[in-house]
Curated annotation (Swiss-Prot):
Alphabetized UniProt keyword annotations: DNA-binding, Metal-binding, Nucleus, Transcription, Transcription regulation, Zinc
Keyword match Acyltransferase: no
Protein name: Sorbicillinoid biosynthetic cluster transcription factor 1
Protein's UniProt keywords contain DNA-binding: yes
Biased composition (Polar residues): 291-308
Length: 620
């Protein structure tokens, strides 16, 4: 006997859990109760299959993320366009920083006192779904987005970090199968390009997470997956310079988007890899002109041998040189305010300075450049160096200023033999001051974008950064002289003279910052806020000592603080220094009011108003 009649039970019997007789069009129970008998013939499955909900959740997250990115880009394009009714030229911030915009824009017509920063939040730890990852671990992107990020990198990042050969990179950028080091480098390049872009800034979080994961995976992943060595030291895998470049770019990106301590850890990792690969000894065996011949042995390339190398070989060698000097500049300048000991010292470097950018990218045979110590000793040679080589020389000069300050702090005065130590101090001080003054005089004048005549000067933000760096060295030397205990009247007179030089240098920095167009802040070096804060701190501490401070003193401090406000929208280091500067200015206002009266009150009111505007726009 059948336990159940054929057909489906009606909804009323299913609700009551009663035995339906399945009579159509109305069963007996529904007929007795006077209810409508409803039978559902087709029902949906009782539950999802295994993994179906997880897949739907990933797809939904990806769709929502893309929609939010597109919505943010549309909102940014509609809100950040600058209208011509403001007396300024209309600039589309969603486009890349094109050289044609530089020709048409002007320096004086852009009002730096009305900041409109794009809102970039600090990077937060996120998890990227496996469906968005390629087998290499990279984030899956469309071909158009990859091309845009590569273009943005060479327009905005490469001018301040010129260590990659464009043609060589583009030859393998679109390949699906590349080495792990090149995959990490490609992802790091696109990560920092997105971080310095207005249209891809929201997408940089996922790119950063993928790049960081790829680099850390290369650290813990051995050739056979074991945590101990299974080969001899000589047969272990070599450190590819693309891996060092990826860590350096990640460190630059973290200066923009993360706390300074995290960025210092990434830069330390890059320097340690660089030391293991011995990139500082590339040209040790060039000839008898090598300055440091006591270092360990490493493969090197002599100038005569370089002329006979194929294009790919000498380009790779030059990339290694530029990788070393990029790490050297970052190591020197990241300690501008903290006096943190550097890890790369000029005494250990046996690598020639980088060749001119035009020759490097154009594929011309390299001209042998000089070494850093001999270039520092011949001040006349600095005029013929490229912008990147000048940046290396000036970064080393600033590093010597920090070492000079550290030596002065280690000596206590007065003590036995203090007179000879005082002479040594002023001898070092005068040499450094003369080198800094010569650098400020020989620097090419910074031109407005519409005044640039050539491709090199038109798109070279490193030249303006070099000038600011030379002025910052003058300020650092003045602070060192002020901090030292004066023994004689001559010491006091010398310190006052260096203060006058530093004051003029701080005004020049403020003038350069004032003339800079707002869109140029997307192409500034990540450690530029250190130099801006150094100048603002010097003007803040020296201005109250004068009886009647000039009006341009107040304007200089104001422009420097507003510049930090602009940079804070794209640079986390600038955001931290802006908060610190705001606290310093508030503390100095109470002291300065007693000395100077209402002028400082006006400055404080003006500066606080602009900082409040920037904080309001950032919070929105």
């Amino acid at each position: 006997m059948r336990r159940q009649q054929s057909g489906l039970a009606c909804e009323e019997c299913r609700r009551r859990k009663a035995r339906c007789d399945r009579v159509r069009p109305q069963c007996g129970i529904c007929a007795d109760a006077g209810r409508t008998c409803i039978v559902v013939d087709k029902r949906s499955p009782r539950g999802p299959k295994k993994g179906q909900l997880k897949d739907l959740r990933y797809r939904l997250d990806g769709t929502i993320g893309c929609d939010m990115d597109e919505l943010q880009m549309l909102n940014f394009a509609s809100s950040e366009s600058i209208s011509a009714s403001d007396g300024q030229e209309a600039i589309d911030w969603t486009l890349a920083y094109d050289c044609r915009e530089e020709r048409s824009g002007t320096w004086n017509h852009l009002d730096i006192s009305n900041p409109r920063p794009c809102i970039i939040t600090p990077i937060s730890p996120i998890q990227t779904s496996a469906s968005e990852m390629t087998p290499k671990g990279e984030l899956d992107m469309s071909d158009l987005m990859q091309a845009d990020l590569d273009l943005l990198y060479f327009e905005r990042v490469h001018p301040i970090v010129p260590m990659i050969h464009k043609r060589r990179y583009l030859s393998w950028a679109n390949e699906k199968t590349v080495s792990p080091a090149r995959a990490c480098l490609r992802s790091a390049m696109r990560t920092i390009a997105a971080a310095m872009s207005a249209q891809f800034c929201a997408f940089s979080d996922k790119l950063y997470a993928c790049t960081r994961s790829m680099l850390e995976m290369q650290d813990v992943q051995g050739e056979n997956g074991l945590p101990w060595m299974t080969t001899t030291r000589a047969s272990r895998r070599r450190i590819e310079h693309e891996m060092i470049q990826a860590w350096l770019l990640l460190a630059h990106c973290e200066f923009l988007r993360k706390p300074e301590q995290d960025a210092l850890l990434a830069s330390t990792r890059a320097v340690r890899l660089l030391q293991l690969s011995r990139l500082f000894d590339i040209d040790m065996h060039d000839d008898e002109t090598s300055p440091n011949e006591n270092s360990g042995s490493c493969p090197s390339v002599s100038p005569s041998t370089t002329q006979n190398l194929p294009d790919e070989a000498w380009i790779e060698t030059e990339e290694k040189r530029r990788t070393l000097w990029t790490a050297f500049v970052l190591d020197c300048l990241s300690s501008m305010l903290s006096d943190r000991p550097s890890m790369l010292h000029e005494e250990m470097i046996n690598t020639r300075l980088p060749m001119p950018e035009r020759d490097f990218q154009g594929g011309q045979r390299p001209t042998p450049m000089g070494f850093l110590p001999e270039t520092m000793g011949k001040t006349g040679d600095c005029e013929t160096l490229s912008s990147f080589a000048q940046c290396v020389v000036l970064a080393n000069l600033f590093g010597r200023c920090i070492a000079h300050r550290r030596l002065a702090q280690s000596v206590s005065f007065p003590e036995s033999g203090s007179e000879s130590k005082s002479r040594q101090f002023w001898m070092r001080h005068e040499w450094l001051a003369a080198a800094a003054a010569h650098a400020t005089r020989t620097m090419p004048p910074t031109q407005a974008p519409n005044e640039c005549k050539s491709e090199t000067t038109k798109c070279d933000p490193l030249a303006a950064f070099n000038r600011i760096l030379a002025y910052s060295a003058c300020i650092s030397l003045s602070e060192t002289a002020e901090a030292r205990a004066w023994e004689t009247l001559d010491d006091h007179t010398l310190a006052l003279s260096y203060r006058q030089v530093a004051s003029q240098a701080a005004y020049e920095i403020a003038l350069l910052i004032q003339k800079a167009p707002r869109i140029a802040f997307f192409k500034m070096h990540p450690v530029l806020p250190n130099a801006i804060y150094l100048a603002a701190r010097f003007l803040r501490t020296t201005t109250p000592h004068f009886a009647t401070p000039a009006e341009h003193d107040h304007n200089s401090i104001h422009h420097l603080l507003v510049a930090l406000g602009y940079l804070s929208s794209v640079n986390n280091l600038a955001r931290d220094l802006l908060v610190k500067a705001e606290a310093d200015v508030g503390k100095s206002a109470r002291i300065a009011t007693e000395v100077t009266g209402s002028n400082w009150d006006a400055l404080m009111g003006d500066t606080s108003r602009h900082i409040g505007m920037m904080e309001t726009s950032i919070s929105v």
